[in-house]
C-alpha cells in the first residue's frame, strides 16, 4: 500500500539521520554521522565500552553489560580507540554508551555518554540501570 511499512521505516531513518561538524583539535574536516533514534526504537539502547582490553577492564565491562542486558538491548565493543567506538555507536543510533575505565575499578563509577549532546557524566554502577531508564523516560531530541 502507499502507506506501507517501507515508507514509514524510510521516514524514521531520514528524520533521524544527521551529519554534524565536530570541533576537534584543529581538524576543520571532522564530521560525525548520527542516527537520532528515540531510545525506545533504537536497535541498541546502550553500548558498553572498556577503555582498554587489559587490566581487568574488559572483564568488568562484560559484567556490566550482562547486568544491563536484563533491561536493555546492549552491545559490547572493545575494538579500536574509544573515540572511534563512540562514532560507530553514533552511526548505529545507540543513544547511550557506558565507558568502563580505571576509575570504575577504584570507585565503582562509569562514564555515561549521551549520543545527541556527546555529554559525559559519571554514574555509580549501582545506579546505572535506573539512570538510563530515567533518561529514556525524559528523552527529548537535542
List PLM regions with ranges:
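NTP/phosphate- and nucleic-acid-binding module
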Residues: 1-142
Amino acid at each position: 500500500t502507499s502507506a506501507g511499512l517501507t515508507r514509514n521505516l524510510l521516514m524514521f531513518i531520514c528524520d533521524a539521520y544527521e551529519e554534524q561538524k565536530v570541533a576537534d583539535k584543529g581538524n576543520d574536516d571532522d564530521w560525525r554521522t548520527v542516527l537520532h533514534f528515540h531510545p525506545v526504537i533504537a536497535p541498541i539502547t546502550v553500548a558498553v565500552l572498556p577503555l582498554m582490553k587489559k587490566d581487568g577492564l574488559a572483564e568488568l565491562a562484560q559484567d556490566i553489560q550482562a547486568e544491563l542486558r536484563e533491561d536493555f538491548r546492549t552491545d559490547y565493543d572493545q575494538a579500536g580507540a574509544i573515540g572511534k567506538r563512540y562514532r560507530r555507536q553514533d552511526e548505529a543510533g545507540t543513544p547511550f554508551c557506558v565507558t568502563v575505565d580505571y576509575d570504575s575499578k577504584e570507585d565503582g563509577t562509569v562514564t555515561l555518554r549521551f549520543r545527541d549532546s556527546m555529554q559525559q557524566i559519571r554514574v555509580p554502577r549501582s545506579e546505572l540501570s535506573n539512570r538510563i531508564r530515567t533518561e529514556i523516560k525524559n528523552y527529548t531530541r537535542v
